[in-house]
UniProtKB/Swiss-Prot annotation:
Keywords: Nucleotide-binding
Lineage, uppermost ranks: Bacteria, Pseudomonadati, Pseudomonadota, Gammaproteobacteria, Pseudomonadales
One Pfam family here: DUF520
UniProt family annotation: Belongs to the YajQ family.
A GO MF label: nucleotide binding
Purpose of the protein: Nucleotide-binding protein.
Annotated source species: Pseudomonas fluorescens (strain ATCC BAA-477 / NRRL B-23932 / Pf-5)
Record protein name field: Nucleotide-binding protein PFL_4775
Source domain of life: Bacteria
GO cellular component labels: cytosol
Cited CDD domains: YajQ_like
Amino acid sequence: MPSFDVVSELDKHEVTNAVENAVKELDRRYDLKGKGSFEFKDKELTVNLTAEAEFQLEAMIEILKLALVKRKIDVQCLEVKDAYASGKVMKQEAVLKEGIDKELAKKIVAHIKDAKLKVQAAIQGEQVRVTGKKRDDLQEAIAALRAKEFGMPLQFNNFRD
């Protein structure tokens, strides 16, 4: 039976390149030169921002978002936490979310069932497997999922006949 997987993954190399581009852009900006820094933690997929004032942090977040978009990474996966003061500097954390949690997986399965397509969806850890009898039904399911906004970037891989 034909099937495909719905996943939400990030290319860690592209994320690293985007953060490095954001650091270069930060060095080029005359209003932020020497006033802020990005620190990317690869294992946790977090970016720690440090600046002297909150408006500088907001500008740094915009620089980071632009760098992510240029590297073709959807900014919906970026969750920006609240800024907090630490001594004389302001700090903020941005977390890159990866994987489909149970709540989102249930929404995806419910959306597929509501579309009344001739496919079945099953939650398998951090992905959703969709199976059907015909390839056309699966392509309709992909189109239905692309049409709805889930708050996370979705990729469709492992398409098998």
